[in-house]
């Protein structure tokens, strides 16, 4: 049955990671990954944030403005800390900043963050972030992405699969926006609502363990949030599933504007 794609260092003892499904298919998991990519240029990921707690790194997110970060709902944890302006996780830039959540809001309710359904979460920071050489926001989408668009997904997730190798620096990989039926063929029970299907049909490039919550960027705008997919990653005809940010744009802008009554799609 489906398993949540979790960071192996956190839950490998509790979960049968990568276990086969009843029908012989590979396990559907979450907390995604970068396979087949390259080290990101520090100037190209100024909005990328690093989420961690006492157990270590677990997700990425995206800075939207001085006070708000966007990530996946299944990245919700206790005692989240947020590093901004990070490239090499062992090296601290002078302009690096650390914040904690003042408020966490999920689409269903402030206290009910789900794993896959409406996999989106806003984090309000405890104090505003100062923009700098290594820290800048990313724009929300003005329009949904076109089919076939080449977009970049990034994060500190494993760069090998099924073996797990976590890099010190974020990796980026270019993938394509695909038609929803492509993902429905790979995952017959999934809903096609409020998601993007993205990847490379022949395999070899994908997000993977540790990339969840990070951005899928198309033409300089965040169009997707890494949500879930198959493990091992980057397999033939098995793209990844991303939360479709454009469908949540009104909700995001309403929450940021202070409208607690805004309706989630």
UniProtKB/Swiss-Prot annotation:
Keyword Glycoprotein: yes
Main localization category: secreted
Active site (record annotation): 74 (charge relay system), 119 (charge relay system), 212 (charge relay system)
Glycosylation sites (chain numbering): 112, 130
Activity dependence on pH, as recorded: Optimum pH is 8.0.
Record-annotated membrane-spanning stretches: none
Key words of the record: Disulfide bond, Fibrinogenolytic toxin, Fibrinolytic toxin, Glycoprotein, Hemostasis impairing toxin, Hydrolase, Hypotensive agent, Protease, Secreted, Serine protease, Signal, Toxin, Vasoactive, Vasodilator, Zymogen
Any GO BP: proteolysis
Single GO cellular component term: extracellular region
Signal peptide location: 1-18
Thermal behaviour (record text): Optimum temperature is 65 degrees Celsius.
Tissue note: Expressed by the venom gland.
Post-translational modification: Harobin contains three additional Cys residues than other snake venom serine proteases, suggesting an additional disulfide bond. In addition, it is more stable than other snake 6-disulfide-bond serine proteases, since it is less sensitive to DTT.
Control of this protein's activity: Inhibited by PMSF.
Superkingdom of this protein's organism: Eukaryota
Disulfide feature: 40-172, 59-75, 106-152, 107-264, 151-218, 183-197, 208-233
Name of the top EC class for this enzyme: hydrolase
Gene Ontology terms for molecular function: serine-type endopeptidase activity; toxin activity
Residue ranges of the propeptide: 19-33
Residue ranges annotated for the Peptidase S1 domain, each copy included: 34-257
Protein localization: Secreted
Cited Pfam families: Trypsin (PF00089)
Miscellaneous: Negative results: has no fibrinogen clotting ability. Is not a plasminogen activator. Does not affect angiotensin-converting enzyme (ACE). In vivo, does not show hemorrhagic activity in mice.
Family: Belongs to the peptidase S1 family. Snake venom subfamily.
Role of this protein: Serine protein with fibrinolytic and fibrinogenolytic activities. Degrades Bbeta-chain (FGB) of fibrinogen first and then the Aalpha-chain (FGA). Gamma-chain (FGG) are also digested on prolonged incubation. In vitro, it cleaves high molecular weight (HMW) kininogen (KNG) releasing bradykinin that promotes vasodilation. In vitro and in vivo, it cleaves angiotensin-2 (AGT). This explains the reduction of blood pressure in hypertensive rats. Also has antithrombotic effects on thrombosis animal models.
Protein name: Serine protease harobin
Species per Swiss-Prot/TrEMBL record: Hydrophis hardwickii
């Amino acid at each position: 049955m489906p398993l949540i794609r979790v960071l192996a260092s956190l839950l490998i003892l509790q979960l049968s990671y990568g276990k086969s499904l009843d029908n012989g298919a590979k396990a559907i998991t979450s907390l995604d990954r970068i396979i087949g990519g390259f080290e990101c240029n520090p100037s190209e990921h100024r909005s990328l944030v690093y989420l961690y707690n006492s157990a270590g790194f677990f997700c990425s997110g995206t800075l939207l403005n001085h006070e708000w970060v966007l990530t996946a709902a299944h990245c919700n944890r206790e005692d989240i800390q947020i590093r901004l302006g990070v490239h090499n996780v062992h090296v601290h830039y002078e302009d690096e900043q650390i914040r904690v959540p003042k408020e966490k809001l999920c689409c269903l309710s402030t206290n009910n963050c789900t794993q896959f359904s409406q996999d989106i979460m806003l984090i309000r920071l405890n104090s505003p972030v100062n923009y700098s050489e290594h820290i800048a926001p990313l724009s929300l989408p003005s329009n949904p992405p076109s089919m076939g668009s080449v977009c970049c997904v990034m994060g500190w997730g494993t760069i090998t699969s099924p073996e797990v190798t976590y890099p010190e620096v974020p990796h980026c990989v270019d993938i394509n926006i695909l038609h929803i039926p492509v993902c429905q063929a790979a995952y017959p029970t999934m809903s096609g609502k409020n998601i993007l299907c993205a990847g490379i049909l022949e395999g070899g490039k994908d997000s993977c363990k540790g990339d969840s919550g990070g951005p899928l960027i198309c033409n300089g705008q965040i169009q997707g949030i890494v949500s879930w997919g198959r493990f091992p990653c980057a397999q033939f005809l098995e793209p990844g599933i991303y939360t479709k940010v454009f469908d949540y744009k009104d909700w995001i802008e309403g929450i940021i504007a202070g409208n607690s009554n805004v309706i989630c799609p």
